[in-house]
Amino acid sequence: MAEKIPSISKINELFQNKEMKPSELFEQVYETASYTESVLHAHLELFYDEGLKLSKESDKRYTKNESLGLLDGIPIAIKDNINIYGYKTTCSSKMLSNYVSPYDATVVTSLKKAGTIFTGKTNLDEFAMGSSTENSAYGPTKNPWNPDFVPGGSSGGSAAVVSAGSAVASLGSDTGGSIRQPASFCGVVGFKPTYGTVSRYGLIAFASSLDQIGPITNTVDDTRIIFNEIQGYDSKDATSITPEFTKLDNKKIKIGILKELMQEGVSNESQNEVNKVVNLLKEKGHDVTEISLPLTEMALSVYYLIAPAECSANLSRFDESDMALEKMHRQVMK
């Protein structure tokens, strides 16, 4: 494991105080990637030349005290089912092995405007269908804590690069746990935002009514910073909404704990950790109340009806595409 990378706020402080340059940080994470990738295979492609160029532009902004904000100069990795103009988006599939994106996903546009530096595209289970990142056409990703273990999936590459220190943060996509589960396996923070709060424009769909793009980071505060940058209404996504957030400050709030998620099937260790947080919140004066959603037990069954139906419809559009497969290969497949 590489030396732990500071939080985004701390990095920004180092930049502002001229104690570190964005180009130095980029070189650091690239060096980490260069000696971990042979084992982990978390990045499918690294953007060294472009990243170094943009990081030096960020250097100049900080020198002139004209930084674009907290994310200016921060190296972030992007899951390879999210489009970046001019780069391949393969979804870890041979079907899209030659597809070069002609446009940016909305989240990518937002991060570019914030001065983010992209480290590269990360590995995933093919078309984001899987939970181990073993089912990639380009080979499996390993867990940075122990290469004999899987990193989870489908955003296993995005979780692994953050855990290994070859990116400060990353974006993944989550349909039924594909950000949260690999983040847990790799010991980092994964967040699936509320559906509609982050635009899906430019995300190659798995199940359109369940997919959501979200951040994987080292800290909860880093997650907040990235989410604030990528959230918001987008006219290019018909399911996009305008989020309404309430600033809590030090207000006392009422918090529900879902009874059905604190029962059989949830490990004692997990329940104990949740209970520690519950006790802390109570000590702070918040009202923590047990609530019940009886239909929770049906959620997995409903997921396995919706997800296969929608992914079948979404993936059928690639059947006659010439994005990747040469005619000779197509003849072999027929």
Predicted stretch roles:
Residues P22-E27, K56-D59, S267-L293, L325-H329:
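Acyltransferase
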Residues H41-L46, A238, I253-K254, L258-L261, ...:
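Flexible, acidic loop-helix segments that line cofactor/substrate-binding pockets
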Residues L71-C91, N250-L258, I306-K334:
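Short helix-loop capping/hinge segments that flank enzyme active sites or metal/cofactor-binding pockets
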Residues V29, G51, D104, T223, ...:
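Residue-level signal for inorganic ion chemistry
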